[in-house]
Amino acid sequence: MPHPDGDLDRRIELLTAQIIAARKAYYQENTSLMSDVEYDALEHELKDAEHAKGFSDRNSPSLTVGIAAQLNLFEPVKHIEPMLSLDNVFSLDQLHSWYEKTKKICPEGDQCTFVCELKIDGVGVSLRYANGYLISAATRGDGAIGEDITQNMLYVPSIPPRIALPGIFEIRGEAFIKRDEFDRINQLSLERSKQFANPRNFVSGCIRTKTPNMRYLESISFYAHGFTQVYGYTSGGMNLHSDITASGGVKTEIEHGMFSAYSRLSECKIPVNSYNRLCTNFSEIESYIENIRLNRQCVPYAIDGIVVKIDSLQKQALLGSTTKAPRWAVAYKFPSESTVTRLLDIEVSVGRTGRVTPYAVLQPIQLDGSEVSRATLHNQKVIGDKDLLIGDYVRIRKAGDIVPEVLCALPEKRDGSEVLFKMPSLCPSCGAELMPSKLGDIDLRCPNMQSCLVQLAGRLEYIGSRGVLDIAYLAEENAYALSHLRKFGKSAEVQLFKITIDDLVALEFMYKGNMRSPFRKKGDSFPGFEEPTKSAQDMVDSIERAKRSPLWKFLLALNIRHIGPASAKALADHFGSIESIINAKIDELLKVRSLGETIAISVHDWFRDPWRVELVNTWRSDGALFGH
C-alpha cells in the first residue's frame, strides 16, 4: 500500500536524520549507535523510500559518503579523486546478479576477471606520496575532503615513509589492528583500569587525535586496496600512471589490472593483503567466499565480508562511479553467525544518566571465537516484542561481529517453567522510584541523579575516559571506589579536583567479592604510613592536567544528557565560555549549528539544577579552567 506523500516525506526525513547521526558517531566520535546490519537496513529503506517518491536530494545519505571532516580539529586534505564507499549485497544471489550485469562490459570472447579481497573492519585512510615521499595521510571525511592525520600515521610501522614511485600518488587502504594486538593492549589497559570497546573504535580513536600515543599507533597495521594519481591512466578512482615502470625502481612490467598492480605496490614495500585472489568466473568467487567463511576465525583481524572488483583498470574506467560508490566493485556482507543458548535470567543495570537497561544473562556459549554470557535487551518493549521469557532457549548473534544480540525466543522448546520478566519499579542501586523522563518515553530512569551511587560511579568513569578528561586509572573499579569515598560522601564528582594522594592511599573497598586497595604499595608498612603506588601519583598528575582541558571536553565531563563530542564542540565554538552557556536561553541555544530542540532543552535544563551549578562552581574554584 503506497505511503501518503506526507508520511513518505516524514519517513525520509527520519531515516536521513538516523543515518547522519550514525555516521557522525562512527566517523567522528569513534563509536557505533547501531549494528552494521541495522545501519545497512536504514540505508536500504531510505533508497526504497526515495525511489517511491521519485526524487533524491543531492545531499541525501543515499548519494553521499561518510560525514564532513571536523575542520575545527584537523587541517583539511582534498582528495585527488573522491574517496568513495561501496555498495553492499547480502546474498550470493544478489552478488551473482551484480556479477552478470558487470561482466557485460567485456567483449564477446574476452575473459572478464575479478579480484576478491577481505573486507577488513577498520578505518579508511588515504596516503599521498610526492616523488616517493609521504607528504600527507587523511581520513575519508565526506569523500571529497578528509582530515589531516599525517603526524599520527607516521608512527604506523607498515606505512613506508618512501616508495619507489614517481609523481604524486595516492594509496587508499585500511588501518586496522590484529586481534592478538588488540587483546594485548586491552590486557595492559586492564592493569591501568582502562579498556577499549572494540578494535575498529580503538583504531579510529588512535589516528584521529591531537595527542597521539606512540605505543598504540605502533600496534596498528595497514593494507592498501586502491590507488590514484594526479595524471596518467585513469580508471574510475583507481589510477595508474603509464610511465611508472619506465621511471625505474622496480623492474617488473605492470599491466593495467588491479591484481598485477597490487604486486607492484607490494614490491614498493606498500603492504598488500596476501588473501587477495584473482577469479576468472563466478564459481571461483563463490568458492573463495565459502573458504573464507569457513576459516574466518583463522584470519587474524576482524572482517565483515568480501569485496569483489573487476580486475581491468580500463573496464573500471568504462563502468565509472555514482556519487557514492564505484560500479565496478561491490561488498558482499557476511550474514551474522548465530547460535542457540539458554536465557538464564534478565537483570537490569543503571547507566550514568540514570537510564535503566535490562540485559540477558545467558548460559555461556562460544560464538565467533569468544565466550558470550550477556547481551543487552535495551528496554521492556524489546523484551515484549521478542516474546522473551526467563528460561527460554534463545537464538543469539554478534551484531557487527562485536556486540552480542538476542534475536528471538524459541517457543517450541518451552516446557512451562519459563517466567515472565517485569521491569523493577525501584532503582536497584538507591531505591528511588523509576519513571520515564517524559510522557511517552519507553525507557525508565532513576531520577536520583545526585545521590545514586551507581550513576555517580558511571559519571566518574566517563569523566576519566580518553575522549573526555583522560584521567589515568579512573575506570570502572576505581570510579566505583571514589563514589564510596567516605571523605566526600556522595559528592566525589563535585570534589574531583580536590583528590589527593593521601585520599587514594586510604581507599580500601570490596569489589566483586575481593578487598581492594589499588593505590597502596603491598608489603610491610605501619598503619597510617602506607606508601602510595606510582599509579596514585599518575592519577593525581592527570587530574591536575585535566584542569587545562578545552571547554568542549568539560561540557562532556558534565554528563549532560544527549551531549556528545560533536554537539559539545559546537556549543564551545558558538558561545566561547561556560558562563555564556549557563546563561543561554533555549532560543539562543537553538541558534547553535547542528543543535536540535531536544539537545537545547537538555542543556538549558541541566544548568537550572542548583547542585549542577554547584558542581561547575566548585570545579572552577578548585582550578578547572573550562578552556580559558
Swiss-Prot record:
Its cofactor is Mg(2+); Mn(2+). It catalyses: NAD(+) + (deoxyribonucleotide)n-3'-hydroxyl + 5'-phospho-(deoxyribonucleotide)m = (deoxyribonucleotide)n+m + AMP + beta-nicotinamide D-nucleotide. NAD(+) binds at D36, V37, E38, Y39, D40, S85, L86, E117, R140, E174, K309, K333. It is an enzyme of class 6 (ligase). One of its GO terms (molecular function) is DNA ligase (NAD+) activity. SMART domains: LIGANc. Its EC number is 6.5.1.2. The active site is at K119 (n6-amp-lysine intermediate). This is DNA ligase. GO terms for cellular component: cytosol. PANTHER family: CHROMOSOME TRANSMISSION FIDELITY FACTOR 18, DNA LIGASE. GO terms for biological process: DNA repair; DNA replication. InterPro entries: DisA/LigA_HHH, DNA_ligase, DNA_ligase_AS, DNA_ligase_CS, DNAligase_adenylation, DNAligase_N, NA-bd_OB-fold, NAD_DNA_ligase_OB. DNA ligase that catalyzes the formation of phosphodiester linkages between 5'-phosphoryl and 3'-hydroxyl groups in double-stranded DNA using NAD as a coenzyme and as the energy source for the reaction. It is essential for DNA replication and repair of damaged DNA. The gene is ligA. Zn(2+) binds at C427, C430, C446, C452. Keywords: DNA damage, DNA repair, DNA replication, Ligase, Magnesium, Manganese, Metal-binding, NAD, Zinc. Belongs to the NAD-dependent DNA ligase family. LigA subfamily. It holds the Pfam family DNA_ligase_ZBD.
